[in-house]
Amino acid sequence: MWVLASKTLSSVPFPFLYNPIPNRHSSSSKLKLNSSVKFEYETERGLDFETGESFFRHESATGRDLGVLAAALYKKSKARLRILDGLCGCGIRSLRYLVEAEADFVLANDANDDCRDVICRNLSKVPRGSDDEPRWTVTHTDANRVMTECYLQREFFDLIDIDSFGSDSSFLRPAINALRFDGLLYLTSTDGYSSGGHRPHHSLAAYGAYVRPLPYSNEIGLRMLIGGAVREASVLGLRVVPLFSYYSYHGPVFRVMLRVNRGKLSDNSHYSFVSYCHQCGNSQTFHGMNSVRLVAPVAMQSPLSSRGRFGQDLFTTPPILQKC
């Protein structure tokens, strides 16, 4: 992992897509004026946009910057860029992909259809293009359903951005399935409670990592997220390579950019244990599956002690304790 040092398309249309520009002559699409509706205007990197009632954080701008930078570099090297923004909020991330990364197409999805008018107004700053070759489309459904529909219709994407809340790992497999080979997967976790080791059984269920309290929980949170993606990809016979990771204390927010390709992991060095001693502060990493044989005998010979050393398997094994 580097901590910030960074299929074939078919012509079948999406059956679940809405018209991104409502019919102005339809009474159901007219803008309803309501005193309870807020129209908040913001500016990010020179782009003006509305937030409305959608969830938006100024502090997440750096994470969006990194996503746009990776997308722009991908477009420069591949000469194409199709993006799926699975949880787009007010649409500023999708707008920046269109304007700054010059994406050929962006599918902006958000499950909350109350945000539709705001998203469409923001994206309308970029000409939509023709019906045959649109630049952007807006949908309002579950992100997993959108990605699964795209996968079934062989509508693959070069970059999929999943800016999710908490530690919802259910997005991992649908996102990997809908991604083009050699594509980029931008994942998010905001579950600082689990990465801090306060819910080890929750992190085990979500990412296959049994996490205990450690002084470097920010790094563990990033590794936990990457490890979950590596495991899901390996089940599908795919290989994940981390390009960069980003941590921010607000939230907190863990973001990782991954490249997904054909081929399984060449060895078991990606499966490791991390140990930490609360007495002396020493930390150790045991690489490979042989670490089970290296650490387990010591644990069996020593009494379990909360003041001793514990080992954390980043995938499936409970903590292993030994005396410091």
Predicted regions and their residues:
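SAM-dependent transferase fold signal centered on methyltransferase-like domains
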Residues: 2-324
